[in-house]
């Protein structure tokens, strides 16, 4: 993937969660299935945070496509952090790893290797 990015060809990034929408509660419409079916790589946090998108991806992705759950790959269950908006009883962490530079570096490494 890094080589393709460096060459400047072949990459189209499509976000499926509309701007201003809570990605944790987003229920993807059927049109998202079409986007997922065309993808070579689908990147999500994982960690139980986008289950409807993950389920739709698994049901619609083409053969050879990769589902990359970056948070699941980087953050161990023993490292999960819970807070008022993501209580432990709910079973889903509040990683916000994208605001932590070492975590972001790990995320990028996982995506590169996917």
Predicted regions and their residues:
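Extracytoplasmic metal-acquisition and chelation regions
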Residues: 1-114
């Amino acid at each position: 993937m890094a080589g393709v990015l460096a060459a400047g060809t072949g990459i189209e990034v499509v976000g499926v969660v509309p701007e201003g929408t809570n990605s944790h509660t987003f229920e993807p419409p059927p049109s998202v299935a079409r986007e997922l079916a065309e993808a070579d790589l689908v990147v999500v946090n994982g960690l139980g945070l986008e289950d409807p998108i993950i389920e739709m991806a698994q049901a619609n992705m083409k053969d050879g496509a990769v589902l990359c759950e970056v948070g699941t790959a980087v953050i161990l269950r023993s490292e999960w952090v819970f807070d008022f908006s993501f209580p432990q009883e709910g079973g889903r962490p509040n990683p916000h790893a994208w605001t932590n530079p070492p975590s972001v570096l790990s995320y990028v490494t996982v995506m590169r290797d996917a």
